[in-house]
């Protein structure tokens, strides 16, 4: 049995047939929690086509109880997912380090900043200081947004100074770049990175 930090047990995702996956809408409305799956498929596409090498960081697990039925075998009876201290994804594109977090919300008017933790913000700041490309991909209001880390820090500092604890829909739309959904790649965030960080170098 594996538990998350909030005490809930881990439930494996149900298998989705290829036929159903092909019918997915180009809108994120009423889609459920699929952002991570779509990003993982996108990263597989980037890797297979030698575009970028981006991987999801494994969630750290704390093992609590191990049973040894045999000396040569060990069975994990109880474990907990530990809270990640950094971000979800990292890798490399055209020689630049890429580091980003993926977040979703069902809130219809704002994106709650409680989705982030202090140590994640500090990690992103450290990446930016080293000239890494750091950002957040946010699924909200039926769309997907690319928000640069520097823009996120502005909203975070406002919260830390007893200001608003969320990003309003209009604020997010003004500060971020919308990501058009496709089939392959599904969420083409590299095209935005190319425009922001590499088009001026050519």
From Swiss-Prot:
Locations listed in the record: Cytoplasm
Biased composition (Polar residues): 8-32
Cofactor, how bound (note): Binds 1 Mg(2+) ion per subunit.
Catalytic activity: Endonucleolytic cleavage at a junction such as a reciprocal single-stranded crossover between two homologous DNA duplexes (Holliday junction)
Residue runs in coiled coils: none
A cellular-component GO term for this protein: cytoplasm
Top EC class, one word: hydrolase
Keyword Hydrolase: yes
Keyword Metal-binding: yes
A Pfam family recorded for this sequence: RecU
NCBIfam families, per the entry: PRK02234.1-2, PRK02234.1-5, recU
Known role: Endonuclease that resolves Holliday junction intermediates in genetic recombination. Cleaves mobile four-strand junctions by introducing symmetrical nicks in paired strands. Promotes annealing of linear ssDNA with homologous dsDNA. Required for DNA repair, homologous recombination and chromosome segregation.
Annotated protein name in UniProt: Holliday junction resolvase RecU
UniProt organism field: Bacillus velezensis (strain DSM 23117 / BGSC 10A6 / LMG 26770 / FZB42) (Bacillus amyloliquefaciens subsp. plantarum)
